[in-house]
UniProtKB/Swiss-Prot annotation:
It is found in: Nucleus; Chromosome. The modification Phosphoserine is found at residue 15. Gene3D superfamilies: Histone, subunit A. The nucleosome is a histone octamer containing two molecules each of H2A, H2B, H3 and H4 assembled in one H3-H4 heterotetramer and two H2A-H2B heterodimers. The octamer wraps approximately 147 bp of DNA. Residues 1-12 have a biased composition (Low complexity). This is Histone H2B 7. Core component of nucleosome. Nucleosomes wrap and compact DNA into chromatin, limiting DNA accessibility to the cellular machineries which require DNA as a template. Histones thereby play a central role in transcription regulation, DNA repair, DNA replication and chromosomal stability. DNA accessibility is regulated via a complex set of post-translational modifications of histones, also called histone code, and nucleosome remodeling. GO terms for molecular function: DNA binding; protein heterodimerization activity; protein-containing complex binding; structural constituent of chromatin. The lineage of its organism: Eukaryota, Metazoa, Chordata, Craniata, Vertebrata. The modification N6-acetyllysine is found at residues 6, 13, 16, 21. Keywords: Acetylation, Chromosome, DNA-binding, Glycoprotein, Isopeptide bond, Nucleosome core, Nucleus, Phosphoprotein, Ubl conjugation. It holds the Pfam family Histone. Monoubiquitination of Lys-121 by the BRE1 gives a specific tag for epigenetic transcriptional activation and is also prerequisite for histone H3 'Lys-4' and 'Lys-79' methylation. Phosphorylated on Ser-15 during apoptosis; which facilitates apoptotic chromatin condensation. Residues 1-35 are annotated as: Disordered.
Length: 126
């Protein structure tokens, strides 16, 4: 039985700034490739929760892997749900159901309420 195709949409991510190398006469500027990560967002949340606490680069790397993993799981599950219901669009409803299926008990409840709050804030700002 063929497995449903997994969608991997590229989320908008912010991270380290591009660094330019020193320029010689006649040379064109070469920019270093951007490494996308969730590090600035993880850092912002850390400062909201614990303003006096820092984070090591190794811990940040672990957090980045964690966020990427959870994103892929939720996106995959939401894609499957849309496919089962013969829909071609992943809506907030599929995301919410995917979160309920993937996260355990109280964690799912909190995630759903925070997600609902974020969607409400977004739609009211439009």
């Amino acid at each position: 039985m063929p497995e449903p195709a997994k969608s991997a949409p590229a989320p908008k991510k912010g991270s380290k700034k591009a660094v330019t190398k020193t320029q010689k006469k006649g040379d064109k500027k070469r920019k270093r490739a951007r490494k996308e990560s969730y590090s600035i967002y993880v850092y912002k949340v850390l400062k909201q929760v614990h303003p006096d606490t820092g984070i090591s680069s190794k811990a940040m790397s672990i957090m980045n892997s964690f966020v990427n993993d959870i994103f892929e799981r939720i996106a995959g599950e939401a894609s499957r749900l849309a496919h089962y219901n013969k829909r071609s669009t992943i809506t907030s409803r599929e995301i919410q159901t995917a979160v309920r299926l993937l996260l355990p008990g109280e964690l799912a409840k909190h995630a759903v309420s925070e997600g609902t709050k974020a969607v409400t804030k977004y739609t009211s700002s439009k």
